[in-house]
Design a protein with these regions (language model features):
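Strongly charged
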Residues: 1-56, 63-145
Length: 145
């Protein structure tokens, strides 16, 4: 089977332009998911390491990545990607006024590396039907005060 990303075409409205017709956009449609066990099996077929050993390493990798992010370290997974914690929140007038309680969100920034960039560069696409149709929300009439 040729490798391709499946997509469907879906209507989207611009919420700031009420009353205008929707425009149509591509939306990726997943074919399924790949678990750690699935990845271990795939990796086993490309090398001499047994599936259970690969799985054990992948599970340990989860723990090591989480611990490194908790320590404020940047996680570089070779040419695959880089992971780093970022923060956002409210500002203070002065540095002295700043308190940790002003931090409102913690996120993991994902930056794809060369391997993923190259994978995206060579994508093929196959159009499919919409998998999960989102029901159009009915607009409620404005209530007068």
């Amino acid at each position: 089977m040729a490798r391709s990303v499946t997509y469907s075409v879906v209507p989207r409205r611009n919420p700031s332009e009420k009353g205008t017709p929707p425009k149509y956009y591509a939306q990726a449609q997943a074919r399924g998911d790949v678990s750690l066990r699935d990845m271990a099996e795939r990796i086993q077929s490309t090398c001499t390491v047994h599936k259970s050993d690969v799985y054990a390493v992948l599970v340990a990798l989860e723990d090591v990545i989480a611990e490194a992010l908790q320590n404020g370290e940047i996680v570089r997974l070779g040419d695959l990607c880089t992971l780093q914690v970022s923060l956002s929140g409210k500002g203070a007038v002065t540095e002295e006024d700043y308190d940790v309680s002003l931090i409102k969100k913690k996120r993991v920034n994902f930056r794809p590396g060369r391997v993923l960039a190259n994978a995206l560069a060579g994508l093929n696409f196959t159009k499919v039907d919409i998998k999960y149709a989102k029901e159009e929300e009915e607009e409620e009439p404005d209530e007068e005060a």
